[in-house]
């Protein structure tokens, strides 16, 4: 069964993950994560104006969301995750971003390899 993936939207939800969560990072992304007590993973995406104009920022958010959606079946459920984009992310393609997110997730307790 496919797990549901919802988005973090409220400022209060983001602040809770920033202040209470743990962090892993690489050159494209800083990832904050913490348990949420629910049966689903929730993801939020923060892309500042330093990354580019709105078209670029929205594209980055779409790529991050799709990458996380594809990897969600390999994750333990019940976590809030916030991805914060770093400067060079606008130059990265989809496959690079997906690999980058997967490497970050493997450093956390969220990731569990499942057989297909």
From Swiss-Prot:
Enzyme Commission numbers on file: 3.1.26.5
Pfam family, one: Ribonuclease_P
Domain of life: Bacteria
EC class of the enzyme, as a word: hydrolase
Role: RNaseP catalyzes the removal of the 5'-leader sequence from pre-tRNA to produce the mature 5'-terminus. It can also cleave other RNA substrates such as 4.5S RNA. The protein component plays an auxiliary but essential role in vivo by binding to the 5'-leader sequence and broadening the substrate specificity of the ribozyme.
Stated family: Belongs to the RnpA family.
HAMAP family reported in the protein's UniProt record: RNase_P
Name of the featured protein: Ribonuclease P protein component
Organism: Caldanaerobacter subterraneus subsp. tengcongensis (strain DSM 15242 / JCM 11007 / NBRC 100824 / MB4) (Thermoanaerobacter tengcongensis)
Organism taxonomic ancestry: Bacteria, Bacillati, Bacillota, Clostridia, Thermoanaerobacterales
């Amino acid at each position: 069964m496919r797990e549901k993936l919802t988005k973090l939207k409220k400022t209060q939800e983001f602040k809770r993950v920033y202040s209470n969560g743990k962090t892993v990072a690489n050159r494209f992304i800083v990832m904050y994560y913490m348990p949420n007590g629910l049966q689903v993973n929730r993801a939020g995406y923060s892309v500042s104006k330093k990354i580019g104009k709105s078209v670029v920022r929205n594209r980055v958010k779409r790529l991050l969301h799709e990458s996380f959606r594809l990897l969600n079946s390999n994750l333990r459920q019940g976590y809030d995750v916030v991805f914060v984009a770093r400067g060079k992310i606008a130059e990265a393609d989809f496959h690079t971003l997906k690999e980058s997110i997967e490497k970050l997730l493997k450093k956390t307790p969220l990731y569990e390899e499942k057989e297909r």
